[in-house]
Amino acid sequence: MISSFAKRVAISIISASTIGLVNPAQAASAKMNATPVNETKFAVVAAPIRGSGRSQLQIYEQVSSERACFSKNGTSVDPLLVSFDFTNICRRYIDSNGYSVRIGDRDYTATYSLNIRRNGNELLLVATPSRPDVGPELEVARANGNGDGFVSLTLNAGW
């Protein structure tokens, strides 16, 4: 099953990876294309930032079947790729060079950033505006349960 979110994540990831290969002027004008992806090959994760009590967004992609890149058990994710050289086996996207906020055909990289925030006992992935006049904060995904360590995030409908 291919979800709308997985399509957008993959597009943003692929586009960001490709854009890094061209000059900044070309990158600024590049348009991202929609390409279907298999969402089971991706894990959207709230990864702990050591010693801070906070988490950051990481996205893992299974590129080949040579070795598993991650394992999910409920809301927990085991990032298996950290235990081996994952070149040509997995991809890991850990910052805005690897993902962005898109709504429709518009890229909001310059105006929204993706952040993990705790709301009570739950972790949320939110798109936070850089300025008040840009728009509201948007909830993109949630953990759907309490978790510590590496926590799987489920995208909200439409993402």
What are these regions (language model features)?
Residues 1-13:
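Bacterial N-terminal signal peptides that target proteins for export
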Residues 8, 16-27:
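C-terminal segment of classical bacterial N-terminal signal peptides
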Residues 9, 17, 52, 65, ...:
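Residues in flexible loops and secondary-structure boundaries
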Residues 13, 28-30, 41-43, 87, ...:
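Residue-level detector of functional hotspots within protein domains
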Residues 26-82, 118, 145-159:
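Extracellular/luminal recognition modules and glycoprotein regions
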Residues 61-125:
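Structured domain cores in non-transmembrane regions
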Residues 101-159:
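Low-complexity intrinsically disordered segments
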